[in-house]
C-alpha cells in the first residue's frame, strides 16, 4: 500500500498495539498465490471489481510479532483507492477483488505480495515481512 503514516498515527497505532483477534488458521481460505482470507462479516452492497473506487477502514500488523504498523481507524480517516490500479500492495488488489460493500475481512499476505525484500522502514515493516490486515469495506463506487 502506498500510504505513509504520520508520527501521530504511528503513536496512536502503538497505543492499541495488541495481538489482533483472528480466526483460527483452518478458517482461512487460501488462494493460489498464498494469500489467506477469512470473511468476518459478509456485506450486502455492491461488489468490487478492477477499477472500483473503494473506501475502507483497515488495521495492519506484522505477522511475525503482531506489531501494529498502521491503522486508518487510529488516524480517524478511511483510506480510499482504486482497485487493480497498483495504488496498493498487490495482496490487497487480489484479496479485495469481488468483495461486497459492508464486508469485514481478515487477510494474511505473504511478503512477496506486500513489500517484499525492501520493506518500508518508515512504517516499521522490515524486509520479507508477511502482513496481517483487518479490512472493512465501507463504500464501493
What are these regions (language model features)?
Residues 1-141:
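Cross-family detector of peptidyl-prolyl cis-trans isomerase
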Amino acid at each position: 500500500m502506498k500510504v505513509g503514516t504520520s508520527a501521530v498515527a504511528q503513536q496512536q497505532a502503538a497505543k492499541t498495539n495488541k495481538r489482533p483477534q483472528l480466526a483460527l488458521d483452518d478458517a482461512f481460505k487460501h488462494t493460489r498465490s498464498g494469500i489467506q482470507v477469512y470473511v468476518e462479516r459478509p456485506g450486502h452492497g455492491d461488489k468490487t471489481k478492477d477499477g472500483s473506487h473503494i473506501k475502507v477502514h483497515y488495521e495492519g500488523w506484522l505477522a511475525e510479532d503482531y506489531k501494529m504498523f498502521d491503522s486508518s481507524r487510529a488516524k480517524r480517516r478511511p483510506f480510499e483507492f482504486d482497485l487493480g490500479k497498483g495504488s496498493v500492495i498487490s495482496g490487497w488488489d487480489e484479496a479485495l477483488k469481488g468483495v461486497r460493500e459492508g464486508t469485514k475481512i481478515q487477510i494474511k499476505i505473504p511478503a512477496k505480495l506486500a513489500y517484499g525484500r525492501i520493506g518500508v522502514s518508515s512504517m516499521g515493516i522490515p524486509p520479507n515481512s508477511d502482513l496481517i490486515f483487518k479490512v472493512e469495506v465501507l463504500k464501493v463506487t
